[in-house]
Swiss-Prot record:
<protein>
    <recommendedName>
        <fullName>UPF0181 protein PM0480</fullName>
    </recommendedName>
</protein>
<dbReference type="InterPro" id="IPR005371">
    <property type="entry name" value="UPF0181"/>
</dbReference>
<dbReference type="Pfam" id="PF03701">
    <property type="entry name" value="UPF0181"/>
</dbReference>
<comment type="similarity">
    <text>Belongs to the UPF0181 family.</text>
</comment>
């Protein structure tokens, strides 16, 4: 599930991801769904960054 786009997160980015996952779970989403959702968001952000630097 992890890929290069997710492995290079700063500590701050990791903390934000954890908080987002916890928020989604508090709203009723399962842990697996929340993790997948946040991972997809991170991949999309990374892809946008890569596209703007190309």
């Amino acid at each position: 599930m992890l890929d290069n786009a997710l492995l290079g997160l700063t500590h701050e980015q990791q903390q934000e991801a954890v908080e987002k996952i916890q928020q989604l779970m508090a709203e009723g989403m399962s842990s697996g769904e929340a993790i997948a959702f946040v991972a997809q968001e991170l991949r999309q952000k990374q892809q946008k960054l890569n596209n703007t630097h190309s």
